Amino acid sequence: MFIDCSKYAGKCACGREHTMETRAAVIEPGCLFEFEKYMAQFGVTGKRCALYGENSYAATADRHPRAEQKIVLDPTGLHANEISTAEVLAKLEGDVEVIVAVGSGTIHDIARFCAHERGIRFVSCPTGASVDGFCSTVAAMTWYGFKKTLPAVAPEIVLADTEIIKNAPMELVLSGVGDIMAKYTALADWKMAHVLTNELLCEKIYSIMQDAADTVMQSVPGIARGEESAYADVTYALIMSGIAMQMMGNSRPASGAEHHISHMIEMEPEAFPVKFPAMHGEKTGVGSLIAVREYKRLAKIEDITPYITDYAPIPEEHFRKFFGERLADSLIKENENDCLAKVSREKLSASWGELRHIIDDLPTEEYLYRLLEMLDAKRDLASIGVEESELSVLLKNSPLVRNRLTLMRTRRMMKIYEIE
């Protein structure tokens, strides 16, 4: 499968001109053996450094891309953060002109960030269908404990070898399925924000993301049977998600309330115990179930007007008490110009019928749960290290990790505990 990314660039009916940094993506068995052909075809020249984790280095042993320098990172406790990026930047030879990421999500975020810091080119070789960030223009980092996106470089070319991807640990593709499942609530949140505040909504990008999500959900039985074509479908959807984000210029089409749930768990607030880590996509998959359940509950209300309250900012004291001093200052700054302040009582009341229709179009929690169950994937809070008793705390505080309008954030303007 060859994706010509240039066709997604240019003027659009939404009024914007979309730009694309990624030129092409190849999703084929054995395509890493043809690495040199694609580098020549797209004119990617200069000294290379290939960045691996120990696991991806072993998995691709018979097809390592040619590179003058190789950096292999210890996967123990490896995260895309200030520590790993400092290590790579210190090791990266000064005359390297191209970074080649050979690995899954963490390796890619480290590589794309370092490419941006050095002002050099970036090529992506995913070894697991685990996250939708392969084509991203930003790096998803945990920076001094705070989950944030930092400027980075999108890959010029993506070479996804499905022979490698299919033989990767099952938890990687389960994470990828969870990350794509998350697009349903992310898209609903985007559309609801458009209704409430006239936030820009591009129908072309929306359609790309919707199709990607539907493709993966239909491929779940094939994944369960170990079919390589199903793994290719997941990889395709993850890459298209990244292309959609490039077109938009941010992660809005791919990230909503379910991602904020995942991010809050990853940040480990002081007053929120997390027993053990889980992969990003595993958390967004569970986050999707939680968000769909809550949104469907709210949609049962025919008239929200009696439950609407005035907007009120979150007191600084709450950030310090719940998130702790390690995270408080960053989150206070993140929420300074609260997007929820743009939503009036009148607009929320008048738009409620339209919001209910958007929620009605979401897949049911039962349908999404059955798909995760078919793969024996994680599908409740306990499986991702969080007590079920913490659910209400999670729903209340997770929107605060990102200043982005979602229905979950809008709950602050509802007398939520009076709604049965």
Which residues does each predicted region cover?
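Solvent-exposed alpha-helices and their adjacent loops that cap or buttress functional pockets
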Residues: E17-T19, F42-G43, K91-G94, A115, ...
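Short beta-strand/turn micro-motifs composed of small residues
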Residues: L51-E54, G103, A160
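Short glycine-/acidic-enriched loop or helix-start segments at secondary-structure transitions
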Residues: A59-D62, I110-R112, F134-C135, P169-M170
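A glycine/threonine-rich phosphate-anchoring loop and its flanking beta-alpha core
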Residues: E117-T215
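C-terminal charged capping/lid subdomain of soluble metabolic enzymes
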Residues: M1-R16, K300-E420
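ATP/NTP phosphate-donor binding region
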Residues: M1-V98
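A short, small-residue-rich loop immediately preceding and capping a beta-strand
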Residues: G94-C114, R118-G128
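Active-site segments that bind and position negatively charged phosphate/pyrophosphate groups
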Residues: I208-D360, T364-Y367
